[in-house]
Each structure stands twice: as C-alpha cells, then as structure tokens.
C-alpha cells in the first residue's frame, strides 16, 4: 500500500503545479480522499455488501462534494482536481492516469422510466488511459473515450472519441483531426502555457 500511495501522490504532483508535497496533497486535496474512499467502497461492493458500500460513498460525497458510485471501475492514479461537483456513474470505467477537473459528469442518458430493463446494462462512459477532461464537461452514455484524448471545458460528449482527439463544443467535435494542432499543448482552462 505504501508504494501505491507514493505512486499516486507523485502522479498528482507531476500534474498539478500547486501541489507542494505528499503530505499537503494527502491532507488538503478532496479528490485524493474521494479516490481512497472509493477504493474502500468498491472493495465492499464487490463483496456484495451493497448498502455498506453506498453508505461509504455517501460519506465521501458529504466530505468532498465528489460522487463516485461504488461499482465504478477506476484504474491507477485518477486525479480529480478541484473536484466539487464531479459525478462518476455506476457503470463508468476509468483507465490509468486520468485527470478530471471540477463539475465533470460521467453519466448515463437512459430515461429513468423502466429502470429494471437498464439495471444490468452498460449506461455510463469508459475513459481509457491518460484522458484529460476539462471542468464542466459532460460525457454521457455507454461511449468510449480512447487513450490520450482531451475533452475541453463544458463540452458535451455523446459519441465515441478516438485516440489523441481534442473534443470541444456542444455537441463536442474533434478539433485534432488530421493533426491540425499536433504541436500545441491542450489547455483545459484555455490558458496558454508559458504565456505564449
């Protein structure tokens, strides 16, 4: 567990210039608490102790403002930065080294009527490794966001996203087709890197 925690905290320090130390990240970053509590609630969920798992996830929501369903599958080093309002639905799957900014929703699109027929189906998105999702973005339905894709702030993604795509707008469109911006760094907040 010590190695896991060190790798996790190091990954946050690499991605967040405001992160100063392992201790400060551990004590003051709500996304870290939410991920740790999700690991616990997910383990309990897999033991089929569903109510206890939901109680732990609700405690995490109360403490952090981040809602992660205990059944969601999350890989290594998920960084939820400024996490207030993040929602990760029940059948969501998240790969390794994914970054989510505040108010991101990984949600379903199925209507709440006839929920019995939807109960065992995939309803939420899958984010592959190294995906970055900007603040306020909504990724909805059982779609796949492939590796290294970037989703801009407030984008609404309703269709599968190819590898290395840069998605912006409502509905989101890929602006990285045909390597139009291959040398430019993605800016989830729209701020230029190095004041260029």
Identify the role of each PLM range:
Residues 24, 28, 62, 86, ...:
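Conserved short-loop catalytic and cofactor-binding motifs
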Residues 52, 56, 99, 105, ...:
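Extended, non-globular alpha-helical segments
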Residues 31, 36-39, 72, 78, ...:
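Solvent-exposed, flexible loop/coil residues
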Residues 117-140, 144, 170-196:
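C-terminal segments of enzyme domains that contribute to small-molecule binding surfaces
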Residues 31, 47, 69, 89, ...:
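Residues at secondary-structure transition points
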Residues 58-68, 112-117:
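Short gly/ser/thr-rich secondary-structure transition/capping motifs
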Residues 64, 69-70, 75-76, 81-90, ...:
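Left-handed beta-helix
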Residues 1-64, 179-196:
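Terminal amphipathic alpha-helical/low-complexity segments used for targeting or macromolecular assembly
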